Amino acid sequence: MKSALVWFKTDLRIQDNETLVKAISKSDQVIPVYCIDESHFTTTSYGFQKTGSFRAQFLLEALQDLDEQLRTLGSGLLLVKGKPEVEIPKLVKAYRIQKVYAKREVAFEELATEKKVQTALFKLGCDFETCSTSTLYHAEDLPFSIKDIPEVFTNFRKKTEKDAEIRAPFAAPTRISSPEIPSLVLPDLAELGLEKPITDSRAVLPFVGGERAAIQRLKHYLFDTQLLSTYKETRNGMVGADYSSKFSPWLGLGCISPRYIYAEVQRYEAQFGANDSTYWLVFELLWRDYFRFMFKKHKTKYFLYEGIKTEKVLSKSLNEKLLSQWINGTTNSDFINANMIELKQTGFMSNRGRQNVASYFCNELQQDWRIGAAYFEQQLIDYDVSSNWGNWAYLAGVGNDPRGHRYFNIEKQAADYDKNKAFRKLWLE
């Protein structure tokens, strides 16, 4: 009897999940597994938690949702905690697994873990296969090799849109043959070394983890309200649930896939018509792809102070007082303060806000951009390694910005995007 293990990571869904579909089609029985990686709940070299309370809570909700969905298909989620390179091989031995399926990684730490697991499995004579589950386009479908991907997004976008095709999403399985999977017992946040986040009524949305919540949000934003048709005009908003799609927390944990969203956008366009706004949502998904492919190309460079630039630069020394003012929203700028308080209290911030607080941190406060990126890694409910570090490098002038150092005039930005001070009043009064 052929037994396979599906190692879930940031692909916590049953829709459009190639690892799951492949394992089911090529095996007699499948064991879905999630390993709570203890290294994800440590403190980084910058002094921040690798995973903060907001994202950890969202993750636990997503795991609960995945388990419930798997149970309806005749399976369940087997949860282990520790080092994946220790825990996955243990399960391979216990369940006599011949093959492990997992999503393909691109970032340095994730790749290192993947390699360790692969090495341990090789010693056991167990096969290991990875699938691309996080992008709109498959790397092998791009009109260039990874090493030849253009360093400017516009060049990448134009050629990709012209010469590559987005594959159709995989349908969700209807049945999974599994041995009996023990009931899911999730740790609480205290066991992960975290405090329970306090709910703030001013938050843009009460984000709930899991695929079903993701699909519900997509249905709301597209078919229930047709807000997608005005996305391009409203996406720079800062107050309320619906100025933007807010899909990012679910995309970050893979509760929904870019290809699934794309297919739904196409269905929406067939029903309500295509326009600049419907295109713009896909355009933003392409940015996510771009940063992911850039990570594949440049490997560890996005974690260096000089980023992907060739000239060496001396990193700036940390000013603890300025960092504390930035984190706690007590700087000289009320616009920056409002954004940083929103992030601290809710784990979320608008795209417009993120660009401004990053520019302020790098240019006005003259701090090492990586410290800001590391704080975002802790705090964001929608943290995605490639998007976070890629965007921070971009705004610090050491990433993929063709214009070099990008400087935001914070006062002008506040006047343009928070004209009546509604956002500042919400968070500062």
Regions found by a protein language model. Give the residues of each.
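Short conserved catalytic/interaction loops centered on acidic-Pro-aromatic/His motifs
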Residues: A112, T130, E165, Q366-Q378, ...
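C-terminal substrate/ligand-recognition segments
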Residues: R292, K297, K321-Q367
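Trp/Phe/Arg-rich N-terminal binding region typifying the photolyase-homology
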Residues: M1-A168, I341-E342, S387
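Short alpha-helical scaffolding segments that buttress acidic/His motifs in well-ordered protein cores
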Residues: F247-L251, L281-M294, N339-L343, V357-F361, ...
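Helix-loop-helix junctions that connect adjacent transmembrane helices in secondary transporters/permeases
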Residues: T300-T330
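Short acidic alpha-helical/loop segments enriched in Asp/Glu that coordinate divalent cations
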Residues: K296-I308, R354, D368-Y375, N388-N391
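C-terminal, helix-dominated tail/subdomain
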Residues: T310-S315, E364, Y375-E429
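Glycine/tryptophan-enriched, flexible segments
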Residues: K147-K309, A414-E429
